[in-house]
Design a protein with these regions (language model features):
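Active-site microenvironment for binding and transforming phosphate-containing groups
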Residues: 1-213
């Protein structure tokens, strides 16, 4: 388990990042695979989710996961829908006590958000497709609908580095078409391709809300 210096100082919430280790899954899913949408054995996934629940000190029935689709959809869990079973979204928000919300990532960017004044938390799965289509903006906007007085604390978790994120011209053009200034997130290489800095692109989205992190 890994923790953020920014969030660990708050005693009324818990957070952490898990690595891929410490679970029961085998082969390509080795070992802490929590993806219910994967082709791993369901019993292994459920065992892994139980391990996670125990580690963070929450009942396994109160651990909410998403079926992530690289969308810009945000779901708020409240007293009216907290019995929901299958959540198709790429961000979760809640202010309900004693539940945990979670995000699964490999290369994509995990974002954890805490709104201190109203005790609202959120987690975001920001891949390139979700990011370019507004998953970050949608999450903050939806959080701000709960209350206008906001004090955000944001942590951007581990993700793919730009030196390992090689993309083609078509990918590059999608971002330039969206905004010419997006070219600063790309570095050309010798293969007529580009390296994309997903983390910095997501960071820019966050700072547009005047949030320092």
């Amino acid at each position: 388990m890994y923790f953020s210096k920014e969030l660990i100082k708050f005693t009324n919430i818990k957070h952490c990042f898990f690595s891929k280790n410490g679970g029961v899954s085998k082969n390509v899913y080795n070992s802490l695979n929590c993806g219910l949408g994967s082709k791993d054995k369901k019993e292994n996934i459920l065992n892994n989710l139980s391990i996670v629940s125990k580690k963070i000190g929450v009942d396994k029935n109160n651990l909410y996961t998403m079926i992530q689709t690289h969308s810009n959809k945000v779901v708020t869990i409240n007293k009216n829908n907290q019995n929901i079973k299958r959540i198709y979204s790429d961000a979760l928000i809640t202010n309900i006590r004693n539940i945990a919300i979670s995000v699964l990532t490999a290369d994509c960017v995990p974002i954890l958000i805490y709104e201190k004044i109203n005790n609202v938390i959120a987690c975001v799965h920001a891949g390139w497709r979700g990011a370019i289509n507004g998953i970050v903006e949608n999450t903050f906007n939806q959080m701000m609908q709960i209350n206008k007085n906001n004090s955000f604390y944001v942590v951007v978790g581990p993700c793919i580095s730009s030196k390992n994120y090689e993309v083609g011209k078509e990918f590059y053009n999608q971002f330039i078409y969206k905004n010419k200034k997006n070219e600063k997130f790309f570095t050309s290489n010798k293969n007529n391709k580009f390296y994309f800095n997903l983390r910095e692109y997501v960071n820019l989205k966050i700072t547009k809300f005047d949030i320092k992190f």
